[in-house]
């Protein structure tokens, strides 16, 4: 997995402001500080989600030389042209199968898309041409810029992936993964520059594209104020592993709709599996028959393009109708694939009320004692945002998950 810390502009167009520099300005810090902050948050979150740490996580800023080398190779082969004062571009008209990732009928689709959302910049020969290297604006110093044979500048948004992937995986490799939104532009341009540079077709043998998490049936977006961090999930009384289980409920090629009810159901299902395993351990001696096909059922689900919903279905069936070999096979599945603490001896942490919620509840209790009912109502509303309802009792209060 590579880490982008330079070169991504605010849109798919080849002009505008670098995203990191934009957020650095908004948060009054450097672009490197922004990159480091969110890299550390990301690594912390994936650790809590029991996602294995990647063997190599290269950063774009550490591989500028490799990116420049690819640009130079493409220039030497005659695939590029320069727009004065702007940058060096890939001439997609020289690539006979440009856009093939959009098969079937990619040439027709590409023609339709030539009047599409790709902004046509002054000087571009074709709407689908894309920047390999951007020149730094005159009399303007960017935080993230480097020297190159063509002067100071910064890489286009696609070149870093080709550079880092080929450095660590070779000029041709098996699996490339990314979001479905990258098919028409980012991954299409990666293929174009990489196959022209390294003369390997296909550059990648298999491409996996995931769909996205939605919220309440709609797009998840910061502009819509409907995003959730892992901290938000924990503050609402859920374990990161409840969220991990929730993700398994949709195959990666399908959209997954995030709602409070769906996450609650995922939590209940996970805790239900834990209870079934505890019962199975206690009653193991009473079992006699063997399910000779159980391992194959799990393997078939995973072999069906990582069909995790099918895998969960087989898991629930296996634990509802246990056999002598069920426990060992499920334990292997848990250790190698699921990693959701199914064999945990203590799941009390899943039932704890987060400290932040308890603090709010105590503050509301004090507000009522002080007859500050406006503040008490305000805190009640805030608790509702954490999916908690507070009920007054003779001894104080009771918190109910709603």
Q: Which residues make up each language-model segment?
A:
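Surface-exposed helix-capping loop/turn segments at secondary-structure junctions
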Residues: 48-55, 80, 172, 279-288
């Amino acid at each position: 997995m590579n880490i982008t810390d330079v070169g991504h502009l605010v849109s798919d167009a080849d002009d505008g402001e670098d995203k990191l520099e934009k957020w650095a300005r908004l948060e009054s810090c450097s672009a490197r500080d922004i990159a480091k902050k969110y890299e550390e948050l990301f690594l912390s979150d994936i650790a809590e989600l029991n996602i294995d740490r990647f063997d190599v996580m290269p950063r774009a800023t550490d591989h500028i030389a490799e990116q420049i080398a690819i640009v130079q190779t493409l220039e030497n082969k005659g695939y590029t042209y320069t727009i004065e004062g702007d940058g060096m571009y890939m001439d997609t008209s020289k690539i006979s199968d440009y856009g093939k990732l959009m098969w079937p009928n990619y040439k027709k689709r590409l023609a339709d898309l030539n009047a599409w959302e790709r902004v046509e910049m002054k000087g571009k020969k074709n709407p689908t041409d894309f920047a390999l290297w951007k020149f730094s604006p005159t009399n303007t110093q960017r935080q993230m810029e480097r020297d190159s044979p063509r002067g100071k500048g910064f890489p286009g948004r696609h070149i870093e992936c080709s550079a880092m992937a080929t450095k660590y995986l070779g000029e041709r490799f098996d699996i490339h993964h990314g979001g479905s939104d990258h098919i028409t532009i980012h991954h299409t341009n990666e293929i174009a520059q990489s196959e022209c540079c390294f003369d390997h077709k296909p550059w990648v043998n298999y491409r996996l594209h995931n769909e996205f998490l939605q919220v309440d049936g709609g797009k998840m977006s910061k502009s819509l104020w409907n995003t959730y961090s892992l901290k938000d999930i924990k503050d609402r009384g859920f374990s990161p592993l409840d969220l991990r289980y929730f993700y398994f409920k949709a195959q990666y090629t399908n959209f997954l709709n995030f709602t409070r009810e769906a996450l609650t159901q995922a939590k209940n299902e996970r805790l239900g599996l834990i209870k079934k395993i505890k019962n199975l351990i206690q009653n193991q001696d009473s079992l006699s028959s063997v399910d000779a096909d159980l391992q194959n059922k799990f393997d078939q689900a995973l072999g069906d393009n990582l069909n995790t919903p099918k895998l969960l279905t087989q898991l629930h069936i296996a634990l509802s109708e246990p056999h002598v070999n069920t426990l060992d096979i499920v334990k292997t599945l848990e250790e190698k694939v699921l990693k959701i603490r199914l064999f945990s001896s203590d799941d009390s942490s899943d039932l704890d009320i987060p400290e932040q919620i308890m603090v709010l509840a105590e503050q509301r209790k004090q507000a009522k004692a002080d007859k500050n009912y406006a503040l008490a109502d305000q805190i009640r509303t805030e608790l509702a945002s954490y999916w908690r309802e507070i009920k007054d009792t003779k001894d104080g209060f009771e918190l109910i998950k709603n």
